[in-house]
């Protein structure tokens, strides 16, 4: 499948166009995209769009890109964040092409001189292209800039939230906590479970049920356990039982749980 995606297509230029929606301003098909970058994000998005009926052209980021926006309705820069600005600067601007990046923490300024700019950050983990392409269908996306980014979300059956430029970094920090920090906490679960002689798999259903409760009730109402009950004697025993290297994270998260419990109690009293 990746080999098929890797074949360079004309992105709607010099080919017999398939049936599709038409942009009234440019009279071009809006179901074609060129993606610069063959990492997990670029290949996942390319595969997902191709399966939704789009024509997709994948380009390596080290390839000549000056003409990348020529004859292309949507140009996606799917490179690592630190090089997005330099790649965008190397592309000649085209008023008929929308240039988009996939970075969560960067604003539209990273796309420099291009007249039509947008950002499209998928709120989903993309471990590899096959799984990633499936997860993109129906996913949440943080968007900003040109309305054309909404057409990508629509094509994937996703949902979008517009994030203002001044809030991009805070938004991305929340995404990191939700995904990366959660994984780090589960790494601690695995270590402590091993110390107790219990397989990590035994805790996975608990994690799933907890996430389901948060989704249904919200974090405050979903909190259970010793902190929610005010049972600080049990918390102290936990800290005594843990290896020294595990205590700091446990203590920090117990304090965060205390804040959550206090907020939930205040809300219940109001």
Where are these regions (language model features)?
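NAD(P)+-binding Rossmann beta1-loop-alpha1 motif at the extreme N-terminus of oxidoreductases
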Residues: 2, 8-70
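Hydrophobic anchor at the start of a short beta-strand
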Residues: 33, 55-57, 117, 160, ...
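Hydrophobic Val/Ile/Leu positions in short beta-strands of Rossmann-like dinucleotide-binding domains
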Residues: 33-35, 77, 143
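Rossmann-like NAD(P)(H) cofactor-binding subdomain of soluble oxidoreductases
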Residues: 43-47, 62-132
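Internal alpha-helical scaffold of NAD(P)-dependent oxidoreductase catalytic cores
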Residues: 45-47, 52, 129-216
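Structural signal for conserved beta-strand scaffold positions within catalytic alpha/beta enzyme cores
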Residues: 58, 101, 118-119, 142-143, ...
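NAD(P)-dependent Rossmann-like dehydrogenase/reductase catalytic/cofactor-binding core
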Residues: 201-270
């Amino acid at each position: 499948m990746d080999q098929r995606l890797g074949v360079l297509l004309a992105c709607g230029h010099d080919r017999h166009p398939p049936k599709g929606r038409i942009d009234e301003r440019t009279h071009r098909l809006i179901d074609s995209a060129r993606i610069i970058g063959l990492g997990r994000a670029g290949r996942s998005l390319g595969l997902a769009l191709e399966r939704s009926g789009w024509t997709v052209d994948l380009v390596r980021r080290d390839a000549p890109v000056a003409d990348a926006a020529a004859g292309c309705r949507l140009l996606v820069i799917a490179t690592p964040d630190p090089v997005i600005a330099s790649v965008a600067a190397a592309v000649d601007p085209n008023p008929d092409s929308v240039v988009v990046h996939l970075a969560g923490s960067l604003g539209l300024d990273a796309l420099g001189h291009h007249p039509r700019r947008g950002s499209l950050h998928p709120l989903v983990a993309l471990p590899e292209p096959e799984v990633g392409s499936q997860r993109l269908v129906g996913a949440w996306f943080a968007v900003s800039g040109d309305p054309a980014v909404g057409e990508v979300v629509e094509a994937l059956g996703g949902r979008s939230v517009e994030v203002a430029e001044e809030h991009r970094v805070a938004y991305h920090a929340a995404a990191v906590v939700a995904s990366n920090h959660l994984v780090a906490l589960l790494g601690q679960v695995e270590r402590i479970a091993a110390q107790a002689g219990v397989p990590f798999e035994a805790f996975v259903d608990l994690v799933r049920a907890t996430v389901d409760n948060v989704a249904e009730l919200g974090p405050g109402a979903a909190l259970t356990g010793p902190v929610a009950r005010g049972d600080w004697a049990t918390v102290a025993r936990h800290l005594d039982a843990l290896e020294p290297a595990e205590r700091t994270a446990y203590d920090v998260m117990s304090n965060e749980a205390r804040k959550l419990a206090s907020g939930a109690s205040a809300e219940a009293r109001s």
